[in-house]
């Protein structure tokens, strides 16, 4: 699963996702991509589940690029613990994705295979996404 090797601080504020994505909105590596339509936090487990679904359908042919990285530590307190006594320990890692962000890119497969692979990957994610492809001139 994806997570940072080391961080400057162990815990972070929750934060909010405002507006559209500043960067990562264009296809840079592959010919096909999965674009985010709504803002959300995506966990490392969800990214990994989507990646597995995509690569499994492609039968190891072609190439997959993951364009998001879970660098946000999400904390939680144990069950049945009273409020207070500090912030909980890090439970999992997440990535903030804003609308317009490209999450996955594919190349080396036909369009119908890429479309279906990304559809299966999108089913593992808790957000609305859109299939996009590079415009060849």
From Swiss-Prot:
rRNA-binding recorded as keyword: yes
MF terms (GO), sorted A to Z: rRNA binding; structural constituent of ribosome; tRNA binding
What keyword terms does UniProt attach to this protein? Ribonucleoprotein, Ribosomal protein, RNA-binding, rRNA-binding, tRNA-binding
Q: Name one Pfam family in it.
A: Ribosomal_L16
The alphabetized list of GO BP terms reads: translation
Q: What InterPro entries does the entry give? A: Ribosomal_uL16 (IPR047873), Ribosomal_uL16_bact-type (IPR000114), Ribosomal_uL16_CS (IPR020798), Ribosomal_uL16_dom (IPR016180), Ribosomal_uL16_sf (IPR036920)
UniProt keyword annotation of Zinc present: no
A GO term from the CC aspect: cytosolic large ribosomal subunit
Listed Gene3D superfamilies: Ribosomal protein L10e/L16
In which family does this protein belong, per the annotation? Belongs to the universal ribosomal protein uL16 family.
Summarize the subunit comment: Part of the 50S ribosomal subunit.
Q: What does this protein do?
A: Binds 23S rRNA and is also seen to make contacts with the A and possibly P site tRNAs.
Q: What is this protein called?
A: Large ribosomal subunit protein uL16
* Species assigned in the record: Bartonella bacilliformis (strain ATCC 35685 / KC583 / Herrer 020/F12,63)
Gene name in the database record: rplP1
